[in-house]
């Protein structure tokens, strides 16, 4: 029994379609089984980053790593061909990066930098018709980027303690200075209190005792008339006065440096020594009592 030609054509087309669908499904399954694990997940600056490939078949021809969304020669980092003396061959995108490839398809990026961030893709060639691919996103952060927020309470506490301590020390210093000033002023006033009291008493005494101008010998030498003490001295006064010593000491003015020394009697004028009747009065006038004034007391 022969199969019609039209039926054979339809069967061939159906078989080809089924094979194509099976190949696509196998490719999708291979891509789904291959994935990249980042160690660590969030790398920081100057930290080593391992991109470990999971789901690699036991046998393969080679694998290529790319940095970027496109996979071509300009984005190729390196090609690794196992079984040869020098398996790793760097690509144009390697630059100054320090990358080491491993036979299982993984790669190690040493001392990662923020400029190394981007999309990393790996393509593993099983044969000329089958290539497995996987990709991952890598973001390299600045070193210790989150440390300030972590240590913020500690730094704030230290800052607050420093400020409070400085304020307390300043207040204590100001209090000590104020105490010393007050104590010094109080002691100075206590030492100065006796002086004003003594000066006050002296001023009271001096004000109570009126100063008597000192009599110099020249005044007595110039006097030639006899003193008249009696009723004839004042015609309108009938009282008789006598001289009595004052109980108050004589206080001479400070400006008068020629005051008479009470201990040294004045010389008696020659023309007054010949008159004995007025000798007593002349002696009283020539040698006055050291008193600020003479008290006159009326006698009967």
UniProtKB/Swiss-Prot annotation:
Ubiquitous with highest expression in prostate, uterus, fetal brain, mammary gland, adrenal gland, skeletal muscle, small intestine, and kidney, and lower expression in lung, cerebellum, testis, liver, pancreas, bone marrow and ovary. Residues 1-32 form the signal peptide. Residues 33-157 are extracellular. GO terms for cellular component: membrane. It comes from the Eukaryota. The chain crosses the membrane at residues 158-178. Glycans are attached at residue 104. Induction: Down-regulated by dexamethasone (in vitro). The keyword ATP-binding does not apply. Residues 179-300 are cytoplasmic. Keywords: Glycoprotein, Membrane, Signal, Transmembrane, Transmembrane helix. It is found in: Membrane. Belongs to the immunoglobulin superfamily. CEA family. This is Cell adhesion molecule CEACAM19.
């Amino acid at each position: 029994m022969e199969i019609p030609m039209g039926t054979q054509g339809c069967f061939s087309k159906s078989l080809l379609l089924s094979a194509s669908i099976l190949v696509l499904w196998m490719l999708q399954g291979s891509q789904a089984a291959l994935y990249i694990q980042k160690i660590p997940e969030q790398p920081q600056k100057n930290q080593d980053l391992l991109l470990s490939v999971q789901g690699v078949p036991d046998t393969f021809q080679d694998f290529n790593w790319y940095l970027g969304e496109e996979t071509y020669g300009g984005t190729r980092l390196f090609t690794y061909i196992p079984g040869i003396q020098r398996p790793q061959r760097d690509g144009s995108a390697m630059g100054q990066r320090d990358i080491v490839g491993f036979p299982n398809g993984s790669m190690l990026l040493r001392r990662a930098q923020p400029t190394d961030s981007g999309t990393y893709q790996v393509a593993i060639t099983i044969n000329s018709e089958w290539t497995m691919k996987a990709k991952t996103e890598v973001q390299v952060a600045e070193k210790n980027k989150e440390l300030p927020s972590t240590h913020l309470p500690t730094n704030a506490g230290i800052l607050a303690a420093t400020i409070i301590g400085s304020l307390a020390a300043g207040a204590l210093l100001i209090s000590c200075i104020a105490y010393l000033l007050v104590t010094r002023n109080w002691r100075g006033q206590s030492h100065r209190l006796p002086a004003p009291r003594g000066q006050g008493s002296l001023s009271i005494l001096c004000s109570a005792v009126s100063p008597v101008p000192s009599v110099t010998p020249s005044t007595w030498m110039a006097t030639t008339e006899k003193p008249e003490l009696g009723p004839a001295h004042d015609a309108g006064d009938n009282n008789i006065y006598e001289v009595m010593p004052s109980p108050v000491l004589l206080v001479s003015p400070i400006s008068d440096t020629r005051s008479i020394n009470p201990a040294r009697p004045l010389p008696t004028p020659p023309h007054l020594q010949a008159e004995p009747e007025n000798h007593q009065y002349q002696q009283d006038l020539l040698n006055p009592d050291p008193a600020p004034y003479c008290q006159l007391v009326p006698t009967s």
